Amino acid sequence: MNQLNWQDVTPSLEQYEALLKSAPSLPKKSFTDLQPRMSATISRFSKMSGLTRVLLINCVDNSVYREFISKALQSYANAAIVLSESLDAKRLFDRYSVDVNGDIAFQPGLISQADDGYLIVPANLILANPGLWPNIKSAIQQNLIEPLNLSPTRLSTSVPPSKAYDVKLIVTGERSQLAELEYIDEDFCSGFTMYTEVEEDIHLSEQNLTDYFGLVNWICSQYQLPHLTECGFRRLLLAGMRFTEDQHYLPLGVMWHSQLLTLASQFSDGQTLDYESLDKAIDDKYYRESYLPQRAVYDILDGQVIIETTGEQVGQINGLTVIDMAGHPVSYGEPARISCVIHFGDGDVSDVERKAELGGNLHAKGMMIMQAFLSSALKLDEPLPYSASIVFEQSYSEVDGDSASLAELCCLVSALSESPINQQVAVTGAVDQFGRVQAVGGLNEKIEGFYQVCKHQGFTGNQGVVMPKSNLKHLALHKDVIESIKNGEFHIWSVSTVDEAIPIVMNKPFRGEDESIIGKIAERIENFERHEHPEGIVQRIKNWFV
């Protein structure tokens, strides 16, 4: 068990202080400079001959990135490079029309324009026009292609001859789009193609951070934006770590940087971007996207959704969820009340979400792992004489993932031992069969979701979140949460095992002592086996007539 202070939950930049001071004056690094994998592959592809005619590049499906790829290709190949954002047969292939006199007007297509060079297209265009692919494939394999006759009802004095082309194709798209290409043609995953990807982030190190600062300076210059000050770079690093959900990685997306820095320029003096201007831009973005999260908090405050942040309850715990809403640009956190009740039975733990077809496969897997750990911890020779049902209360949509398995375990052992759970503490984390607490996703959103509820219901000074220790490097919390941790209003505990988590939420050790949770469960089982089962309702009715 480890209660964290505010420094523990804040990304540390101490080792890069000297580099931060020089960041504004570091030489510019273009987008391509920070994509060595892509650049090396483009270089190889430009020198390839023979049957490999297609290069697949996994990247954001955006014309901006295709322009970057085109510029990278220009440095390796002195050849025609044609980009297309639309695809139809009339534009793709050579075509001709015949006038009333039988004269021909010839128009070259994109493939003809890219002859002896490269054609760059988005994967979506091929997916939207699968019927064109056989002809495209034939053309890039240097087979003869007939030009299209746009006036088939008119006779011409002559017909343009068929032609073979020497064209290489570069297809860009996101991973899911590239995967769908394989359904059109299996050759997309054969020696017919090469593959590379645009890297979306960069690992934090002295050299990489130098390159990253150079990239930011290049973006500011490329899009005529004010340059960042030392403090501005500091705020950008924190925002980048929040975006990647990792203190050891920074984003490389030009679109993300351009939007944030352009917005920050509206809050600046027009000359430089400092800490305050970037902070205001981030606050502005948060405000624009916070309607749904605020409505969720208001539903809790109005009592429409029951979430308790004070007192104690047996068999009830505050879990943490991340909500992904279609059409909403960001995920947000929301606490969920998880409850468990037990009754005499055969040891079965009923997953209500699964039975109601609201629980996904990963959630079901987490439930089974949690049950296996508890059975092992109790060291039972036979099944529990109790059955239990666990449910996400007031949950009306699908629940998936194993990140609630630690909370569900705490809830189950609370009901079995009749030991209350502190409602001031919310829990997130996955559990393995040995009781180790494993990392989960969406930590920042989950913590902030519970924080907002505690803030509006009133801080007690003892509220907080139990989270996996292995998730510490993913923390980049909102400044309000950091401030409350500084002031002792809100707390975060990191744990590595179930034995560390149970004492925080139940104020009792999990095992090893007389008053342990395992001891109480064992005692209850023993009492049950020692005494005769209570009469059922049927037996009592029979006794009335004896």
Provide a role label for each language-model segment:
Residues M1-E182, D187, M194-S205, F213-E230, ...:
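Conserved ASCE/P-loop NTPase catalytic core
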Residues S339:
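Short, surface-exposed charged micro-motifs
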Residues M1-P27, A40-F45, P108-I111, I120-P130, ...:
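Peripheral, non-AAA+ core regions of ATP-driven protein-machinery
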